[in-house]
Amino acid sequence: MEDLGENTTVLSTLRSLNNFISQRVEGGSGLDVSTAAPGSLQLQYEQSMQLEERAEQIRSKSYLIQMEREKMQMELSHKRARVELERAANTSARNYEREVDRNQELLARIRQLQEREAAAEEKMQEQLERHRLCKQSLDAASQQLREREDGLAAARETISSLKGRVSEMQLNAMDQKVQVKRLESEKQELKEQLELQQRKCQEASQKIQELQASQEERADHEQKIKDLEQKLCLQEQDAAVVKNMKSELLRLPRMERELKRLREENTHLREMKETNGLLTEELEGLQRKLGRQEKMQEALVDLELEKEKLLAKLQSWEKLDQTMGVNLRTPEDLSRFVVELQQRELTLKEKNNTITSSARGLEKAQQQLQDEVRQVSAQLLEERKKREIHEALARRLQKRIVLLTKERDGMRAILGSYDSELTQAEYSAQLTQRMWEAEDMVQKVHAHSSEMETQLSQALEELGVQKQRADTLEMELKMLRAQTSSAETSFPFCKEEVDALRLKVEELEGERSRLEQEKQALEMQMERLTLQGDYNQSRTKVLHMSLNPASMARKRQQEDHARLQGECERLRGLVHALERGGPIPADLEVASSLPSSKEVAELRKQVESAELKNQRLKEVFQTKIQEFRKVCYTLTGYQIDVTTENQYRLTSRYAEHQSDCLIFKATGPSGSKMQLLETEFSRSVPELIELHLLQQDSIPAFLSALTIELFSRQTSI
């Protein structure tokens, strides 16, 4: 602006000089015409020559001045170009540092992703282990159900055998009824022959006694039928138990279907996780690109701020050894100190990992021992129940054997009475048939008694085996309890480690609850997807293409990493070239992509205009603040100063001393409430505080009363 003003002044002086010369020439010509003196022409010519010489001198001086100014402008332009080159070098160095930081961030993210992938694989292994355990438990349950089915089949066989026996007993009862009818007919025949054959009266009476005995036998048989009916009721109860077991068996395929559905959901969630990871990686890439663009736009604006920050950092570096008490003269010393701290942190982390791994091993061992104790206790209860069942069965069989022996003895007594009372001549065909039937019954009873004895012996043997098994299980339970107690005593931990492990367990439980909540959220999301028209995984087959998106994403990530490394190498070469001060190679000029001089000039102008605007705004703001403070001071009589955050100091214009002030602290949301802090001056006015603040709860009234009191003191003095 000053150069332009000086140029305009030179041009205006030249123009005024030319006008003056033209006016003198015109005035001289008028004198020539009027006077026509021959000597005046020579004088005028000399004057004009002098004026022309002066004009030439002025022009040469102005030209010299202009050349000097152009020289100064060239020097300024050279200085500006040098400053621009230095700034460009600084920006390139900063960009290189940023790229290095970004590469480190990318490497850290890659490590984090690898760690997440390893954690996901561990979780997958844990889930596979859980599925395997569930499968084993299902196999065990199916084995138990098969055993129960075998028991039910055996019970059905016993029921069918008992039904056969009941049918046989019913047939025997029918035969006995037929015999009773036949005996009644014989009784009638004997009554008809009573008058003719008085000798056979005794036989008739004997036959009557036999009939009475047969009636008693029939009553016994009816009692046996009732007993068998009771047994049938018990068998029906057993059948109801069998039915319940069948219903439990019917639940097994539903549980298998649910397990299959959970596995499919797990695979689907893994695929969703992979797609989500790809989308997050793409989103991070886009965010990084957006951040780069924004940083490139804000780089020129932040140059001065970074300069100030660097100066502050330089000062902090110079004061760092004094503040920290560590000999840190250079950044290399700080980097070494940071590396040592990181190594210490790694050692502490390794110790922590070893402690946590040992704690996890102990927890797993304790959990396994607890599971084994539960299993052994459950097996012990089952064996005790089986033993009680076998003991009850043995008691029933013993009762049945006693009844059968009684029946056998009764039948033998009846046959003996028949043999003793009847003679050889009096045997008839009916008696022989009856004898054969009685012998058959005796043989059947013997066979049944032998079967009952074998069953009793088997039941007693099984009872002994079950007792031995129960004893062994009790011994194993005692051994496991002793092992748990020895394990607890063999691993003494200090109280702090136990507390740390408990905290770790609580954190794991919280994580488990969080994972359960996430699982519920994912299940709800799956339900929403199914409502929105998602496909059914049990009916739809998912085809995985040969071009896996995960592998493509990894390949793309590797290419980006290689490209970034190439850019870093090019930027290193550019920085070295700028540090040497030599010419920049062509490939580095292309790679550097520095802005042109016009763009730099425009951006400088924009920066200068923005700085001028900011400076003007600051000046206006300061003036307005000063005016506002003066107005508040004149209107309220108090000067308000901000001491610290949310604390304000009020000094009255009528105060006797400069230290007489009040301090208020802003509390509540957005400083809606003010609290008076205790000072020496506030202790001198307890009456006003009690009246206006405690009773009336009015700060303006308190300030106005204090102003009146101070004003009255000054006027009274």
Swiss-Prot record:
InterPro entries: Mad1. The modification Phosphoserine is found at S16, S214, S428. Phosphorylated; by BUB1. Become hyperphosphorylated in late S through M phases or after mitotic spindle damage. There is a cross-link at K61 (Glycyl lysine isopeptide (Lys-Gly) (interchain with G-Cter in SUMO2)). Residues 540-551 are annotated as: Necessary for interaction with MAD2L1. GO terms for biological process: attachment of mitotic spindle microtubules to kinetochore; cell division; mitotic spindle assembly checkpoint signaling; negative regulation of T cell proliferation; positive regulation of mitotic cell cycle spindle assembly checkpoint; regulation of metaphase plate congression; thymus development. A motif (Nuclear localization signal) lies at residues 79-82. Homodimer. Dimerizes via its N- and C- terminal regions. Heterodimerizes with MAD2L1 in order to form a tetrameric MAD1L1-MAD2L1 core complex. Interacts with the closed conformation form of MAD2L1 (C-MAD2) and open conformation form of MAD2L1 (O-MAD2). It is unclear whether MAD1L1 dimerization promotes the conversion of closed to open conformation of MAD2L1. Formation of a heterotetrameric core complex containing two molecules each of MAD1L1 and of MAD2L1 promotes binding of another molecule of MAD2L1 to each MAD2L1, resulting in a heterohexamer. This is Mitotic spindle assembly checkpoint protein MAD1. It comes from Cricetulus griseus. The lineage of its organism: Eukaryota, Metazoa, Chordata, Craniata, Vertebrata.
